[in-house]
Amino acid sequence: MKSLYFVAGLLVMLAQGSWQHSLQNTEEKSSSFPAPQTDPLGDPDQISEDKRHSQGTFTSDYSKYLDSRRAQDFVQWLMNTKRNKNNIAKRHDEFERHAEGTFTSDVSSYLEGQAAKEFIAWLVKGRGRRDFPEEVNIVEELRRRHADGSFSDEMNTVLDSLATRDFINWLLQTKI
């Protein structure tokens, strides 16, 4: 896109220069006063000075155009930088997240290794097999529950007895 603007600006400047040059030629031809013989219009030095002047004007205009383009590009860069909130900080955040993820991954690997060691120790200890030497152990193993907030076996027994008593009272009070 920048090259398109550059080419368009160059064409505009060339067209403007040729338009100004043609106007100057028209004005010189239409002058009502003939040039005296001592006037150096036909002199090659005068032609080269005019040529250098027009080249200098073109170069000056072109330099001004390039300066304005650089200024526009710089402003655009500043706006993009502000929108992106400084790319260096973004890279730093990504690096920190990567480091934190690596740390988390290392901790997870360590904990998995520890869990595997504990499981192997549990299997070696004999907890993996169910040896029921006494019936007390069977009842105790079957009644054991998670610590997830569920009622214990005793609480269920109490609730069952309360429900049974309420049901019997209801039967006695209702006439069938």
UniProtKB/Swiss-Prot annotation:
Cellular localisation: Secreted
Phosphoserine modified-residue sites: S54, S105, S108, S150, S152
InterPro entries from the UniProt entry: Glucagon, Glucagon_GIP_secretin_VIP
Residue positions assigned to the propeptide: 84-89, 131-145
Induction remarks: Glucagon release is stimulated by hypoglycemia and inhibited by hyperglycemia, insulin, and somatostatin. GLP-1 and GLP-2 are induced in response to nutrient ingestion.
Keywords linked to the UniProt accession: Amidation, Cleavage on pair of basic residues, Hormone, Phosphoprotein, Secreted, Signal
Pfam families the record matches: Hormone_2 (PF00123)
Tissue specificity: Glucagon is secreted in the A cells of the islets of Langerhans. GLP-1, GLP-2, oxyntomodulin and glicentin are secreted from enteroendocrine cells throughout the gastrointestinal tract. GLP-1 and GLP-2 are also secreted in selected neurons in the brain.
GO terms classed as biological process: adenylate cyclase-modulating G protein-coupled receptor signaling pathway; glucose homeostasis; negative regulation of apoptotic process; positive regulation of insulin secretion involved in cellular response to glucose stimulus; protein kinase A signaling; regulation of insulin secretion; response to activity
Site (Cleavage): R52, H53, R83, N84, R91, H92, R97, H98, R130, D131, R145, H146
Gene3D superfamilies: 6.10.250.590
Region feature Disordered, mapped onto this chain: 25-59
Family the UniProt entry places it in: Belongs to the glucagon family.
Name used for this protein in its record: Pro-glucagon
Source organism phylogeny: Eukaryota, Metazoa, Chordata, Craniata, Vertebrata
